[in-house]
Amino acid sequence: MDEELLQRQVPQALEAEQSVLGSMLIDERCVPDVVGMLQPDDFYLRQNREIYETIYTMFNFSEKIDPVTVLNKMKERGVYDEQRSYDYIAQLLKITPTAANVKQYCTIVHLSLIHI
């Protein structure tokens, strides 16, 4: 069994994790709010955590954040998966129609951590 699965229980916030990431990709103006509320380890899925770590790092270095720059930075960091990363980013954009509710999504992710 995957050691990560043994150490963590499945939270009920996977959709909220995806919506947080999608919001940051849609509108980089919400990134400071998210960075103030969530840490990379708050993301349960490895793929979500790697995307968030990438955005988090880009934010800390005042780099522009959008789907193209994030995918490029993921390649630089060695966390880009040729089979999945591009499609997953596209999926995040598709399922997140607006960044307006990003603080609520962050709260849902945060509250799921309390129940682990």
Language model regions located:
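Conserved small/polar residues in nucleotide/adenosyl-binding loops
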Residues: 114-116
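Noncatalytic partner-interaction/assembly domains of nucleic-acid and motor enzyme complexes
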Residues: 1-112
